[in-house]
Swiss-Prot record:
Residues 417-631 form the BURP domain. The lineage of its organism: Eukaryota, Viridiplantae, Streptophyta, Embryophyta, Tracheophyta. Its main location: secreted. Interacts with polygalacturonase to form heterodimers. Non-catalytic subunit of polygalacturonase. GO terms for cellular component: apoplast. It comes from Solanum lycopersicum. The keyword Hydrolase does not apply. Residues 28-109 form a propeptide. Glycans are attached at residues 125, 143, 258, 280, 336, 371, 389. Keywords: Apoplast, Cell wall, Cell wall biogenesis/degradation, Glycoprotein, Secreted, Signal. GO terms for biological process: cell wall organization. It holds the Pfam family BURP. This is Polygalacturonase non-catalytic subunit AroGP3.
């Protein structure tokens, strides 16, 4: 009798002991991680084992663990050992593991006729769309692929031999991540008809936009790009054989690529052998950070072309433009560059074989910046006026630009950098945009990450795994991330890229020891406005210390670039609404005491004055970035 009672009791006690040894935990916000066989359950146990203090767990880090359930985790961990088998399950894996992967669009020979209106539509292949439609008509695409990761859209042989009008509004993933949009043989041989792209790919992260054989051999059609690619980050636009052999087909680019970060545009065989075409670029590349544009064989052999660039790359930071074989062998025609290339920091402009062989072309440059190279151009018909021969220090000074008025350049926006003396209770100061612009992703489980290649020497394997075609944006994203991760560290820097949370813990503890705390700014409240500093606390007593900072890098899975940062002071501060004095955020700021190794053109010195090693520089930790320090 007693044996029958004691045996179940012993089993129950053994079960409870086993479960307790597995550190079964329930996360806050109702996020259960009780199953010890999930990636998150494993991560929590790993934290408990490798961090020596009992301070509250950093759920902002632990919640970035892979969302795979136990069954999915076991399945994909087994599959990844066979990369050929794994790549066939890529789409389901990316969806389950919260990764950013491109969709696979299959070719389509379906024909589309009639007037069509597409609203809130995405990830489609339009082939032979609107081909040889007779009579006037109208096709409209509105709110197409909004706020998506890797939206892929292909328009091939679109509107060929058709006089229809086409309008794309809010097209190209406004606010999306890595959109891939291609227009091939668009409006070729069209008699009339117009195309309008309004608010195209605004605010996109790493857009990849291609127009090939666009409006070739067209007659009298007009193509209008308004607010094209604005506020984007690190993207690439290409126009090949655009308006070639056209007759009176005009193109307008208005507010093209404005406020972009490291944007690239290529125009090849643009307006070649065209008759009487007008091309206007207004407010092109305005207020950008290092925009690069290339015009090759632009307007070559045209008859009476008119090219106008107004406020081109104005008020940008650095930037490069190349015009090769521009308006060569043209008959008559006019090209005007007004308010051209007046960047804050000196950029580079190269004009090669410009207007050569033409019949009386008129080329005018008015109010253009420094560091321009003109090779092999028609000297008799080119005029240059109001050349700004300033030093880079002059141009970098905000008070010297635009008639002595201070210009708000978004790349050195107010509050992005500040002095340590600002971190006092009661100080009112601007806060920059600290919102995380990266796509939402999760870490790979370490067991899976360890089995995937991660080096530039194996990039072909990675491209195969992630279905990344050569020269695709996915391939470029992977290559850029790997190159940055393999870059040699700066003097005194220790660095590592981590694609699992366990790797981040290992790196931080290897630099700082096991008694560590990781911090981030609590939310984005106060961003892009004025804030008041409330109570403030110096980490490690406010003494100069060492920290580890981790910043996101664009990659299919969540990837962080972590590096040791010597000689810093770290602060936590309550952030208040300056009017109501209510607490709206809890921020983390880091002050770099030693800036002697920073470049003289670093944005901090443009914003604050002075130079390397002369001042300390502070900044906030942005949303989803992190800083590690030893625990107090």
């Amino acid at each position: 009798m007693h044996t029958k009672i004691l045996l179940p009791s012993c089993i129950l006690l053994l079960l409870l002991f086993t479960l307790s040894s597995l550190d079964v935990v329930v996360a806050k916000d109702g996020d259960e991680s009780g199953n010890p066989f999930t990636p998150k359950g494993y991560l929590i146990r790993y934290w408990n084992k490798h961090v020596s203090n009992d301070l509250p767990k950093p759920w902002f880090l632990l919640n970035k663990a892979s969302p795979l359930n136990a069954a999915q985790y076991a399945t994909y961990t087994k599959l990844v050992a066979d990369q050929n088998a794994f790549t066939t399950h890529l789409q389901s894996f990316c969806s389950s593991a919260n990764l950013m992967c491109a969709l696979d669009l299959l070719p389509s020979l379906e024909k589309h006729k009639g007037d069509v209106h597409f609203v809130s539509y995405g990830d489609k292949n339009f082939t032979n769309y609107g081909t040889k439609e007779s009579g006037l008509g109208f096709n409209s695409f509105k709110n197409y692929t909004e706020e998506e990761n890797f939206p892929v859209n292909s328009f091939r042989r679109y509107g060929r031999d058709s006089p229809h009008d086409n309008q794309f509004d809010n097209y190209g993933a406004p606010g999306g991540n890595t959109p891939v949009q291609s227009f091939n043989s668009y409006s070729t041989n069209t008699p009339g008809g117009s195309g309008q792209f309004t608010n195209y790919a605004p605010g996109s992260n790493v857009p990849d936009l291609h127009f090939t054989s666009y409006s070739d051999h067209g007659t009298g059609g007009e193509q209008d790009f308004k607010s094209y690619g604005n506020d984007g980050n690190a993207g690439q636009q290409s126009f090949k054989s655009y308006g070639k052999d056209g007759n009176g087909a005009d193109s307008q680019f208005t507010t093209y690529g404005n406020n972009t970060n490291v944007d690239g545009s290529d125009f090849t065989n643009y307006g070649e052998a065209a008759n009487g075409e007008n091309q206007n670029f207004t407010s092109y590349g305005f207020n950008g950070n290092n925009p690069a544009s290339s015009f090759n064989n632009y307007g070559v052999g045209g008859n009476g072309p008119s090219e106008a660039f107004n406020s081109y790359r104005d008020q940008s930071n650095v930037g490069d433009d190349t015009f090769t074989t521009y308006v060569k062998d043209a008959n008559g025609g006019e090209a005007n560059f007004t308010n051209y290339g007046q960047s804050f920091n000196e950029g580079t402009d190269v004009f090669t074989t410009y207007g050569k062989g033409g019949n009386d072309p008129h080329i005018n440059f008015k109010t253009y910046g420094v560091n321009n190279t003109f090779k092999d151009y028609v000297k008799d018909t080119a005029t240059f006026s109001n050349y700004h021969n300033k030093t880079s220090q002059d141009l970098a000074s905000l008070s010297e630009v635009n008639g002595g008025k201070k210009v708000n350049n978004r790349w050195i926006e107010p509050g992005k950098f500040f002095r340590e003396k600002m971190l006092k209770s009661g100080t009112i100061m601007p806060m920059p945009d600290i919102k995380d612009k990266m796509p939402k992703r999760s870490f790979l489980p370490r067991a899976i990450a360890a089995k995937l290649p991660f080096s530039t020497s194996k990039i072909d394997e990675l491209k195969k795994i992630f279905h990344a075609a050569n020269d695709s944006q996915v391939a470029k994203m992977i290559g850029d991330a790997l190159s940055e991760c393999e870059r040699a560290p700066s003097p005194g820097e220790t660095k590592q890229c981590v694609n699992s949370a366990e790797d981040m813990i290992d790196f931080a503890t290897s630099v700082l020891g096991r008694n560590v705390v990781v911090r981030t700014t609590e939310n984005t409240n106060g961003s892009k406005g004025n804030i008041m500093i409330g109570s403030i606390k110096g980490i490690n007593g406010g003494k100069v210390t060492k920290s580890v900072s981790c910043h996101q890098t664009l990659y299919p899975s969540l990837l962080y670039y972590c590096h040791s940062v010597p000689k810093v002071r770290v602060y936590e501060a309550d952030i208040l609404d300056p009017n109501s004095k209510a607490k709206i955020n809890h921020g983390v700021a880091i002050c770099h005491v030693d800036t002697s190794s920073w470049g003289p053109r670093h944005g901090a010195f443009v914003a604050l004055g002075s130079g390397p090693g002369k001042i300390e520089v502070c900044h906030w930790i942005f949303e989803n970035d992190m800083t590690w320090a030893t625990a107090d």
